[in-house]
Amino acid sequence: MGIILVMLCGCTAQQKEWLPGNEMNEESEKEAEIEDLGGKTDKGRSGGLLEQAEGEKAGVDNLQKKEKNLRMKKQWGEKLYQERIRQLLESADPLPKRYDAREEGRTAPVEDQRELGTCWAFSSLTALENAMLPQEIWDFSEDHMSHNPYFILGQENGGEYTMSMAYLLSWRGPVTEVQDPYGDGVSPEGLKPVKHVQEVRILPEKDQETIKRAVLACGGVQSSLYTTMQNGDTQSEYYNPQTSAYCYPNSTAPNHDVVIVGWDDDFPAEAFWPKAKNNGAFLCENSWGTEFGDGGFFYVSYEDANLGKTNIVYTCIEEPDNYDSLYQSDHCGWVGQLGYGEEMAWAANIYTAKYAEVVKAVGFYAVDENTEYQIYLLRHVPENPKKALKQRGEILAEGKLCHAGYYTIPLEKSIPVEAGERFAVVIHLMTPEAIHPIAVEYDAGDGKCQIDLKDGEGYISFEGEYWENVEEQQSCNICLKAYTDIR
């Protein structure tokens, strides 16, 4: 993953990776200097409270009617989400020594990526399909995900989980396999998502207990490994075809994605080539067809060097009418990180309302564990917003997130905005031990993403007093979304 490492100290901007256009202008130099001299004070919180628009009441009846119609549809999804989070975060129940999601009807059919480098799309969508089983059965389109126009890579060039997250969280998908069949080399325009993914958690590296609880809660965990095998090939010194068992002990970077769907603490060490030091393995669902392994499944030793380092789980999946509009400028998602060499920073994205709406929720990435956040919303933002961003008003949501990942946070009260009105979503982030706590998209020079800086207006600040435009200064967009309903 490409990373922007920006440190603003005194009057200069220092970067580990230099990006064009990152020179600070005279105003931002002065601001940075004042922050340094003035200490870490925060005068912005004394600003006026957000005002309620007169038109808010007029839209209440329509909103209540819509919410009533959605209530029954959402009821199952909300209960499922609450139960998942309870299992994942709160359960102290002892874990079984063995679990196989196949036996619970919680694994989607094994698919075949064939000769294309699309394992990342298959593993992502398999994990997503598993997350809704057995109550809902879906077959999502890997073709549509891997043909995302914001990514430059072809299907033969591979991908990674951040690309899957960007596709799903920007509401480009998922669409169904029927709408966009796999392997024809084309993807229809104008397809609408059949689900909205609102939360994706990234679990700690090699945390077996958390991974297992996530499998129990959500049906599967997307992860990565290194393999010398190609699609359908079983020739590898690290794979035992008789036992469908694999273990790679070296430090080579991962090149293949799978879905963890179970485990067996007593899976024998002797089943691996070469023999593992200890018993125990994860059960994984592959995308090489049913001829591979045990009907498309295989065991990977707990001692594998890579499996369990990167762990993605889809914890909140909602109906496509959960919100009317999504405001965003980060179609390529979390490409890098931005900050001031400290664990805290402020960020803001400014949007122009298309209709008379109410802002209901805000979405953002927590770049590491135990991220604390405070969310504000500023109305009637002027064309030059740097001074206005100091007057944030009241906190509309705050909390602490135990896992890294993407979160949609409902506001404690909906904020009305008028058609054509500029409004700012403002967030304060504090991520322990991080020095760049703000997730951004930018051109990392790796040929993966097609970045559009014209669709965003983002700002960052160290203390919330002096703000700089990230499109102008760092050539990036802030990953900070807003969800609205039409009044």
Regions of interest found by a model, annotated:
Residues 18-360, 365-399, 403, 431, ...:
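Catalytic-core signature of thiol
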Residues 405-407:
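Short strand-edge motifs at loop-to-beta-strand transitions and within beta-strands
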